[in-house]
């Protein structure tokens, strides 16, 4: 039985109708794995950075009617929350596992963090071909960096700067049948490799 890896059964949780039913399924089927990933990668980040990280599992506490379409664990250097800081996330939708690092629009000093990405612009463009950007964390769509022109990528960063609701993340995704999800060892290796790349933009 997998401790970390998301299985076909986990993805089917997002087919459960109704808020109460889906939340119950998320809590029983997915959150134990998010907790395990939270422990493992908190230690990983604490080892690979000079800072102390904390894991935050999504609670979806504000929802009253609509069931969540995704869920995640986030990592930040604040024990109380993550939205106000640049942070890492591991999570899933019904047909996608995602891993990403960046800033939400709620982030304090958001422009400073966007400038860090801008300083590493060449490195962003030269990431492996399966890396993506995410400019809205509530949307599943994450275009591949290799499919964007230099001007389009610069415009995404510019919009994150200028718009109050602007956001910017570097991301990587897996489909439910990806070979990296066959075993815990393969999944952890994939995540560690991804975090190694994402840490280039952590400052």
Swiss-Prot record:
Species: Staphylococcus carnosus (strain TM300)
Family: Belongs to the UPF0637 family.
Record's protein name: UPF0637 protein Sca_0732
SUPFAM superfamilies membership: YktB/PF0168-like
Origin superkingdom: Bacteria
InterPro entries reported in the protein's UniProt record: UPF0637 (IPR009403), UPF0637_domain_sf (IPR053707)
